[in-house]
């Protein structure tokens, strides 16, 4: 039985990530099995026919939680009174593309979306940004939507966390459930910081199971950092199904939190407990509180290796921010 209904917008509705994500959303993976969904699916003008096909498939899926499905090429209609938005629509990264190319193209897209959110969405709407460069895109959207709460903007680092989680599980030869406190700091890029020093395996420090520090620093970390490029090289397209799953999990951690769960998210750095510059979107380890709000987990130590990587990632985010004219 549906106990409440949330209004949700998904952009890039005819794209590969959205195609996978929409069915997970409709199934209840994000908001729960008792939460109805008033779903608005947006894509750019010219995609009307493809949007109608997406709607047909959702109708044919006979999802009990879908209270309404609207497809639209109007951002105003998509964002009107929403509780949550998943900003998936963007130019995907292809072989040989540089981050600066993506920043120019996708920055314009999210600026327009931010302005539309500012005029139509609920003030406390939660905004999840996916398109790359995701930290800076999220920052652009946030700054074009000053009416909305800055703390509710999230850049997706969950795919990086999942990649690291899987690699540690394989290396330790333990189930995924045995690995916890997997943390990714900083920018979602090749300069992200997969912080293995916080991880636990069977609730014990990781070094007790994976004693090979050289593997952690020089194999695992670069592998996580470059995994997106490896996927593009292998399949000729950027990650889609795994990105959709990561997005659903990222939102689930907020809407259906598990007690004690840590999750990585790119959030506003204002008043952060690590003394990092404010007015950035920076990847932090987070956890949910009983109040329904998240907090950046304070007091985690950085060893020399992690501290050095953190500075590199911070510098990249600052450089990207400096290249943007709001």
Curated annotation (Swiss-Prot):
Catalytic activity, reaction form: (S)-malate + NAD(+) = oxaloacetate + NADH + H(+)
GO MF entries: L-malate dehydrogenase (NAD+) activity
Covalent S-S links between cysteines: none
Enzyme class: oxidoreductase
Alphabetized UniProt keyword annotations: NAD, Oxidoreductase, Tricarboxylic acid cycle
Binding residues for substrate: 93, 99, 132, 163
SUPFAM superfamilies the record matches: LDH C-terminal domain-like, NAD(P)-binding Rossmann-fold domains
InterPro entries assigned to the protein according to its UniProt record, in alphabetical order: L-lactate/malate_DH, Lactate/malate_DH_C, Lactate/malate_DH_N, Lactate_DH/Glyco_Ohase_4_C, Malate_DH_type2, NAD(P)-bd_dom_sf
BP term (GO), one: tricarboxylic acid cycle
Active site (UniProt): 188
Family: Belongs to the LDH/MDH superfamily. MDH type 2 family.
Protein name in UniProt: Malate dehydrogenase
Organism in which the protein naturally occurs: Chlamydia trachomatis serovar L2 (strain ATCC VR-902B / DSM 19102 / 434/Bu)
